[in-house]
């Protein structure tokens, strides 16, 4: 087994995954990225430029592809995987009545089932580098309190938080850490997308119109580093996430009233 620690990151072709890859690469780790976007992965890894990198094209919805990807990455990294970052995800906004069955299935399959498949595939590798190895799941502030106009997305992120808590307990005796990141709106290319097939409005425009904070993606990467090396189960990223968590815990009635008063689906 090699001496250099190794991290494999899904959704590594852009956004949060790219930022995490860059930070860990700068700090001497062997970095692997998985994505369906080959060009994006190449751009991510070219910026690291130390030769200790690997890219693997695959779809997180394919359970068998997970095994192939992690086996190939471990081979490239000298036989070890210390961290698997379950980061691949897609947005979905709009009222539930407007979301197509295809949109709902795709969001659940990528955001939740993909995370569970990744956890299942990662465990044998993380056991080998325990204690201290880590499964890092990207959840969301939408998994802290249900987000109006993003019910399906919110449900998937609640699922990711729940899976993180369950696996943290299940794997504790194995020495494998399980952590989640709960960011608010992050400055990534996803904000340029429309929230669903019925809308032409970019998510970024909707966020700005609501007066909400957009957090630099580099802050998420630093939070990922802290989560992997720390004891906090859920790491909140950005003021929106922290305020929502505080309100949901200490002022749930007020948060509920505000959610009702400001309810407007992202796609409208």
Residue spans for each PLM region:
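SDR active-site lid
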Residues: 173-239
């Amino acid at each position: 087994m090699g001496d250099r620690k190794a991290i494999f990151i899904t959704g590594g072709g852009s956004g949060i995954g790219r930022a995490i890859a860059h930070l860990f690469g700068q700090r001497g780790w062997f970095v692997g990225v998985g994505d369906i976007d080959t060009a994006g992965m190449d751009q991510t890894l070219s910026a690291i430029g130390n030769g200790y990198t690997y890219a693997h094209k695959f779809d997180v919805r394919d359970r068998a592809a997970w095994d192939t990807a992690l086996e190939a990455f471990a081979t490239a990294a000298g036989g070890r995987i210390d961290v698997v970052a379950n980061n691949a995800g897609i947005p979905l906004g709009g009222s539930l009545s407007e979301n197509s069955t295809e949109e709902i299935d795709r969001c659940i399959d990528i955001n939740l089932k993909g995370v569970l498949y990744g956890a299942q595939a990662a465990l044998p590798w993380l056991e080998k580098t325990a204690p201290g190895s880590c499964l890092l799941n990207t959840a969301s502030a939408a998994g802290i309190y249900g987000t109006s106009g993003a019910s399906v997305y919110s449900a998937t992120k609640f699922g990711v938080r729940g899976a993180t808590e369950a696996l943290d307990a299940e794997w504790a005796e194995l020495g494998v850490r399980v952590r989640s990141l709960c960011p608010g709106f992050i400055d990534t290319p996803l904000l340029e997308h429309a929230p669903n097939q019925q809308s032409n409005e970019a998510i970024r425009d909707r966020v700005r119109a609501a007066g909400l904070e957009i957090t630099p993606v580099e802050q998420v990467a630093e939070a990922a580093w802290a989560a992997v090396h720390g004891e906090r189960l859920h790491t909140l990223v950005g003021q929106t996430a922290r305020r929502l968590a505080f309100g949901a815990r200490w002022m749930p009635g007020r948060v509920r009233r505000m959610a009702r008063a400001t309810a407007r689906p992202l796609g409208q």
